[in-house]
């Protein structure tokens, strides 16, 4: 948004209209929303406050900050990284370049975990949950916040990711019920440690699929949290094989995956022999997104 020599003031409305058009041309899927979030951040206000300020002219310092945010967003930086947080399951989750930005699709994993604990596993007085590849800790804190009697262990191989998860856990005052641990899948756990629910949003992108990801993902989010291997099922196969011994009797394994590998992943689970009631759950777009199963 260039400063012009005419006398037309850069009101909130004009800034939003210009930026929305700019982001639309850049291929943003939500250009108006992006513009509103960034302008609210630059002004230090809630997004809804913009709607009562359309005719106001932000201060020069705010416009300078906004222009920089717009420039970086135009280069592909995710909005969540620019403002430092993302709403997930009605919780504000801190994020940075070391963690994946929580996606709405992952809320279906949280919902499935909560449904299992409230339903079939409701007889367990203090349900235990393992979140593998916790990243920002979004899944772990969402489950813990929703189910006050639940104890959650959240693991990640990345120490920088765990730093962000620690901030989110402490910010939500969940340190007494969410334990963070550096671990490559199950390697860092106690040998006999078992859980009622194991859930994971693991790396599940194949190399060919990764190469086609938009710049905003490929160049700005951690490669190791996305890329699984040539087929995309490498980490999922490990989870299926190793979770059987880590689940309590009747425990539930819940995995987020790409719709492109949903069928083959379900087949792997069926061939494993350690699970029953294996089923896929669709996201709001109708794509098979969650693989859920009970220990046989």
Curated annotation (Swiss-Prot):
MF terms in GO: protein-(glutamine-N5) methyltransferase activity; protein-glutamine N-methyltransferase activity
Protein name per the record: Release factor glutamine methyltransferase
Alphabetical list of HAMAP family matching this protein: RF_methyltr_PrmC
Keywords: Methyltransferase, S-adenosyl-L-methionine, Transferase
Reaction catalyzed: L-glutaminyl-[peptide chain release factor] + S-adenosyl-L-methionine = N(5)-methyl-L-glutaminyl-[peptide chain release factor] + S-adenosyl-L-homocysteine + H(+)
EC supergroup of this enzyme: transferase
GO biological process, one term: methylation
Entry-linked InterPro entries: HemK-like, N5-glutamine_MTase, PrmC_N, RF_methyltr_PrmC, SAM-dependent_MTases_sf, Small_mtfrase_dom
Residues that, per the record, bind S-adenosyl-L-methionine: 133-137, 156, 201
EC number(s) stated in the UniProt entry for this protein: 2.1.1.297
Summary of the function given for this chain in its UniProt record: Methylates the class 1 translation termination release factors RF1/PrfA and RF2/PrfB on the glutamine residue of the universally conserved GGQ motif.
Domain of life of the native organism: Bacteria
Binding-site list for substrate: 201-204
One protein family per Pfam: MTS
Family to which the UniProt record says this protein belongs: Belongs to the protein N5-glutamine methyltransferase family. PrmC subfamily.
Organism, scientific name: Rhodopirellula baltica (strain DSM 10527 / NCIMB 13988 / SH1)
